[in-house]
Amino acid sequence: MTKIETFNIAARLEHWADQKPESVALIEMRSGRQRTFKELEQESSRLASGLIQFGMKSGERVLLMVPYGIDFVTLTFAMFKAGLIPVLIDPGLGKKNVLKCIKQVQPHGMIAIPLAHAIKKIFPGTFKSIQHNV
């Protein structure tokens, strides 16, 4: 049996932040916002530290419900850096299927926009596994 090496994609971000710190890593088309590799590295590291201080632990599943864009990518890298398992569910699946997925996955945490937190209050049974809300 061969040994499987562990790899965290966040290590590649650190590499590119060192190699090309001022190069643009992300461009958000609808707003025009940009982030360099250095900015993305620094912001995602700061957020990762905050998630850990908030009580989230490596290996926990965390539901991410924010619109796709710079914040989504930055939070995803932060979650990888913190050792969290991002739970990404396509809202295009429809309400019934999204709720079914959440109930099945039983995430320990949730990082979301206010609307998602409001929905959590309407369907508390679906979100009962969540102990950390951001």
Model-derived segments and spans:
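Flexible, non-catalytic linker and terminal segments flanking ANL/adenylate-forming cores
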Residues: 1-7
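AMP-dependent adenylate-forming
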Residues: 12-36
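Short hydrophobic/charged patches on amphipathic alpha-helices used for structural packing
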Residues: 14, 48, 98-99
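Conserved AMP-binding/adenylate-forming
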Residues: 29, 33-35, 48-93
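Glycine-rich phosphate/oxyanion-binding loops and their immediately adjacent helices
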Residues: 45
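Structural core segment of the AMP-binding/adenylate-forming
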Residues: 81-134
